[in-house]
Swiss-Prot record:
Monoubiquitination of Lys-119 by BRE1 gives a specific tag for epigenetic transcriptional activation and is also prerequisite for histone H3 'Lys-4' and 'Lys-79' methylation. This is Histone H2B. Belongs to the histone H2B family. The keyword Membrane does not apply. It is found in: Nucleus; Chromosome.
Length: 124
């Protein structure tokens, strides 16, 4: 008689699974793969609740988020260096977003970022 199927882990979940080595008996941890998959999935469900995403598309979205993050971080770092500052503040991030993103997209990103920072500071 076939065994009942176990429930699959949530998409994008990151768990360190321990495996036992054959001869040595020592436990080995599987390396964690960090990704934005769970966050991309949450946003997708907010925008289109009945739509799914393939693993290939999720990989592309993960690469996209990593790329944008690196660009904003790099530009923010450059701005802080130009102004002889050792700290990247929300002001540097905002300016970097304005420089990197075109027109209306930058305006929306800045307003969403401001909203997120306001929500965070009010919750403290």
């Amino acid at each position: 008689m076939p065994e009942p199927a176990k429930s699959a882990p949530k998409k994008g979940s990151k768990k360190a699974v321990t495996k036992t080595a054959g001869k040595g008996g020592k436990k080995r941890k599987r390396s964690r793969k960090e990704s934005y998959a769970i966050y991309v999935y949450k946003v997708l469900k907010q925008v289109h609740p009945d739509t799914g995403i393939s693993s290939k598309a999720m990989g592309i979205m993960n690469s996209f988020v990593n790329d944008i993050f690196e660009r904003i971080a790099g530009e923010s770092s450059r701005l802080a260096h130009y102004n002889k500052r050792s700290t990247i503040t929300s002001r540097e991030i905002q300016t970097a977003v304005r420089l990197l993103l075109p027109g209306e997209l930058a305006k929306h990103a800045v307003s969403e970022g401001t909203k997120a920072v306001t929500k965070y500071t009010s919750s403290k």
